């Protein structure tokens, strides 16, 4: 994954657990970190994001978290604390969408972004045999009550809150299971998020529960998704569906020009992907 830090381009090499930096012309400058347990090493890298006070935050694929200073020295290291008060037996006996213990990091399409001074956001999922979007008595609850984002304390690594229900389109249609991942970005207290099958972009601010929305459907997208009735069938066709059909891919906020960029795939019928540009919540370009 690429990211911008000051006037440099950063790239996280997951294989080597290293961060490579380049100048704005693409010329290599230096590398930081490696895999291990030493002072300048991490156990792995799945996601990295720059945060305030010239620090960095890393999440690996085993729920390990690393807070680093500007020289990539470890300030703190901990594991995600899901803050669940129930035992696994209690959770599975009576699963409820608000139970943090039912959730895990959505590693299929993970992302890490700071929100405000003290928090980070990352996507979560809870596809268990007891509550999922495919089958079972709790399927109806999945899209109406399940939450999709976790609010993590930078200081403690504790999940303070789960937020963001699936939008109405996921409750109305039953064929979106392979396109249920979230896309989002933040800037200071502003938080924009959407979902792969939804044309709307939702906006909320830290400390305010009001949610507004904007957005227009992308051009020439094939969204005639297939419906699946079992977890196995959906999983078996996951890669095939994501190659064949169109979906929204990513959101990026450009605060300096008051712009929001959203990329999308049209589907296998088109050799091109799409790019939308919004300014003050209005679409000004769609390429």
Which ranges hold each PLM region?
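Structural signature of eukaryotic scaffold interfaces centered on beta-propeller domains
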Residues: 1-4, 47-51, 100-117, 178-187, ...
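Short, conserved, GDST-rich strand-edge loop motifs in beta-rich repeat architectures
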Residues: 123-144, 264-274, 278
């Amino acid at each position: 994954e690429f990211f911008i830090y000051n006037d440099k381009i950063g790239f996280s090499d997951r294989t080597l657990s290293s961060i490579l930096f380049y100048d704005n012309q693409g010329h290599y400058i230096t590398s930081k970190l490696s895999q291990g347990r030493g002072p300048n090493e991490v156990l792995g890298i799945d996601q990295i994001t720059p945060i305030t006070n010239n620090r960095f935050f890393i999440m690996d694929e085993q729920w390990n978290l690393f807070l680093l200073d500007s020289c990539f020295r470890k300030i703190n290291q901990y594991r995600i604390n899901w803050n669940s008060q129930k035992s696994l037996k209690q959770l599975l006996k009576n699963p409820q969408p608000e139970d943090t213990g039912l959730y895990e990091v959505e590693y299929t399409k993970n992302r890490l972004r700071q929100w405000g001074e003290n928090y980070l956001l990352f996507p979560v999922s809870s596809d268990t045999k007891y509550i999922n979007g495919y089958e079972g008595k709790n399927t109806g609850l999945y899209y109406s009550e399940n939450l999709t984002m976790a609010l993590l304390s930078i200081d403690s690594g504790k999940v303070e809150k789960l937020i963001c229900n699936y939008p109405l389109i996921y409750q109305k249609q039953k064929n979106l299971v392979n396109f249920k991942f979230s896309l989002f970005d933040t800037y200071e207290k502003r938080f924009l998020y959407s979902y792969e099958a939804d044309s709307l972009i939702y906006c909320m601010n830290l400390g305010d529960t009001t949610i507004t929305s904007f957005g227009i459907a992308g051009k020439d997208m094939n969204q005639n998704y297939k419906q699946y009735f079992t977890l196995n069938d959906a999983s078996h066709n996951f890669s095939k569906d994501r190659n064949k059909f169109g979906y929204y891919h990513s959101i990026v906020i450009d605060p300096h020009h008051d712009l929001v960029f959203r990329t999308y795939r049209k589907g296998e019928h088109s050799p091109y992907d799409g790019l939308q540009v919004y300014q003050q919540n209005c679409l000004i370009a769609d390429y």
